[in-house]
C-alpha cells in the first residue's frame, strides 16, 4: 500500500483518511485497500472522507483530527464549493461522525501549495499541543479554540510559515498517529 503519513489518523481502532488513498493505489480495488488497511494497521474501522479540492497533498491532517471516538475537529470548509461541502457532510453523516469546526484560513493563500492558515495540522503530545501559527489575524482565535478543546494541555505555538510554504505543517513532518 502507498500511504502518506499525513493521510492516516488512527484513534482507538479507527483510521481516518481521505479518498487520496484510492488515487495513490489505483492498482487495487477500494475494497482491497480497505481490507489491507484493516489488516496491516490492526483496525476495526476505516473511514474515508473526500479530500479538499485543490489541496495537492489530499491529506487528512489538513482537513480533520480526532477529538474522540465519535467526534472530529474539522477545518471549516465555509470557503469551499457547495458540491464538496455536500459530499463531505454526507460522508460524515454516513460514518456517524460528529464534528467541531476550527478556523481555516488557507483560502487566503495566493496558491494552493501553501498550508498557511491550516490549524488541524498540529502535534498532540501527552501534555502539550505543538500548534502551528502564521502571524495572521486568525491565529489567536484558533489557539483559543484548541485551548478550549484541550484544557489540560499546554498550548505551544510554533511559527510555521517556512514549513507551510511547501504544503505541509507539523503533523505532516512527524508521521504521528
Where in the sequence are the language-model features?
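Histidine/cysteine-enriched polar flanking segments
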Residues: 1-177
Amino acid at each position: 500500500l502507498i500511504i502518506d503519513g499525513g493521510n492516516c489518523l488512527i484513534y482507538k481502532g479507527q483510521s481516518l483518511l481521505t479518498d487520496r488513498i484510492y488515487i495513490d493505489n489505483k492498482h487495487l480495488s477500494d475494497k482491497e485497500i480497505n481490507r489491507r488497511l484493516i489488516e496491516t494497521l490492526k483496525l476495526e474501522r476505516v473511514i474515508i472522507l473526500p479530500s479538499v479540492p485543490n489541496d495537492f497533498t489530499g491529506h487528512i491532517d489538513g482537513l480533520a483530527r480526532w477529538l474522540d471516538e465519535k467526534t472530529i475537529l474539522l477545518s471549516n470548509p465555509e470557503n469551499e464549493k457547495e458540491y464538496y461541502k455536500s459530499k463531505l457532510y454526507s460522508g460524515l453523516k454516513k460514518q456517524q461522525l460528529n464534528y467541531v469546526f476550527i478556523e481555516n484560513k488557507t483560502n487566503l493563500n495566493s496558491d494552493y501549495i501553501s498550508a498557511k492558515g491550516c490549524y488541524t495540522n498540529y502535534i498532540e503530545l501527552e501534555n502539550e499541543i505543538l500548534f502551528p501559527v502564521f502571524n495572521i489575524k486568525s491565529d489567536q482565535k484558533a489557539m483559543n479554540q484548541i485551548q478550549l478543546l484541550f484544557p489540560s494541555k499546554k498550548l505551544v505555538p510554533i511559527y510555521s510559515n517556512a514549513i507551510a510554504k511547501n504544503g505541509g505543517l507539523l503533523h505532516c513532518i512527524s508521521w504521528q498517529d
